[in-house]
UniProtKB/Swiss-Prot annotation:
GO terms for molecular function: ATP binding; glutaminase activity; phosphoribosylformylglycinamidine synthase activity. This is Phosphoribosylformylglycinamidine synthase subunit PurQ. It comes from Corynebacterium glutamicum (strain ATCC 13032 / DSM 20300 / JCM 1318 / BCRC 11384 / CCUG 27702 / LMG 3730 / NBRC 12168 / NCIMB 10025 / NRRL B-2784 / 534). Pathway: Purine metabolism; IMP biosynthesis via de novo pathway; 5-amino-1-(5-phospho-D-ribosyl)imidazole from N(2)-formyl-N(1)-(5-phospho-D-ribosyl)glycinamide: step 1/2. The gene is purQ. Part of the phosphoribosylformylglycinamidine synthase complex involved in the purines biosynthetic pathway. Catalyzes the ATP-dependent conversion of formylglycinamide ribonucleotide (FGAR) and glutamine to yield formylglycinamidine ribonucleotide (FGAM) and glutamate. The FGAM synthase complex is composed of three subunits. PurQ produces an ammonia molecule by converting glutamine to glutamate. PurL transfers the ammonia molecule to FGAR to form FGAM in an ATP-dependent manner. GO terms for cellular component: cytoplasm. Part of the FGAM synthase complex composed of 1 PurL, 1 PurQ and 2 PurS subunits. SUPFAM superfamilies: Class I glutamine amidotransferase-like. It holds the Pfam family GATase_5. GO terms for biological process: 'de novo' IMP biosynthetic process. Keywords: ATP-binding, Cytoplasm, Glutamine amidotransferase, Hydrolase, Ligase, Nucleotide-binding, Purine biosynthesis. Residues 4-223 form the Glutamine amidotransferase type-1 domain.
């Protein structure tokens, strides 16, 4: 039986179609989830994709974190369901308190659209276990509010527990400690600002490195 991966759509979501395609290429059955859904339809994992949900009003991700679908995601994540937050999805996961820290305006206050080189720091999560620790991957990034920040105690905890998953080699947005992605205590929830779903096919991406995150999830579900 194929892994069932749910992909959420909020008003203002942009990258749900690409995330769904990436999951399908990885061999998953994709289930579309609407922001007003309370029923997760039996999915094994959830992707919270990028975009500008609710127009980024109040704060990026703040309104989406209160949506009915996210209340169900929070409940199931507490039971171990793998969750991936990409860009705006990462922002939503921090607002929902599924991940610590906050994503704030980039240094220089500019929107950046670049192909980002990342170093894999943790390859034991549900979304990175087909990668190698220390491996460099290339996936696109596009955001104006992707500067990861947290208090010193939280940063020390993330570093000490090995919960930094990805680091930028060229820290264009000013994130603390070059952090591009993190995980929770269990390694089942991962958030990152760059877009792995845009790097799954040679025709359209700078690489196919992003596909590994979806393959990892499919393998985790099957295990």
């Amino acid at each position: 039986m194929s892994a069932k991966i749910g992909v959420i759509t909020f008003p203002g979501t942009l990258d749900d179609v690409d995330a769904a395609r990436a999951a399908r290429i990885a061999g998953a059955e994709v289930i579309s989830l609407w922001h007003a859904d309370e029923d997760l339809k039996g999915v094994d994992a959830v992707v919270v994709p990028g975009g500008f949900s609710y127009g980024d009003y109040l704060r990026t991700g703040a309104i989406s974190a209160l949506a009915p679908v996210m209340q169900s995601v929070i409940e199931q994540a507490g039971k171990g369901m793998p969750v991936l937050g990409i860009c705006n999805g990462f922002q939503i996961l921090t607002e929902a308190r599924l991940l610590p820290g906050a994503l704030t305006r980039n240094k220089g206050l500019h929107f950046h659209c670049v192909d980002a080189h990342l170093v894999v720091e943790n390859n034991t999560t549900a979304w990175t276990n087909t990668l190698e620790k220390g491996q460099q991957i290339l996936i696109p990034a596009k955001h104006g509010e992707g500067r990861f920040q947290a208090d010193a105690e939280t940063i020390a905890q993330l570093e000490g527990e090995g919960r930094v998953v990805f680091r930028y080699t060229d820290n264009f947005n000013g994130s603390v400690n070059d952090i591009a992605g993190i995980t929770n205590e269990t390694g089942r929830i991962v958030g990152l600002m760059p877009h792995p779903e845009h790097a799954v096919e040679k025709l359209t991406g700078p690489s196919i490195d992003g596909l590994e995150l979806f393959l990892s999830a499919v393998g985790t579900i099957a295990a």
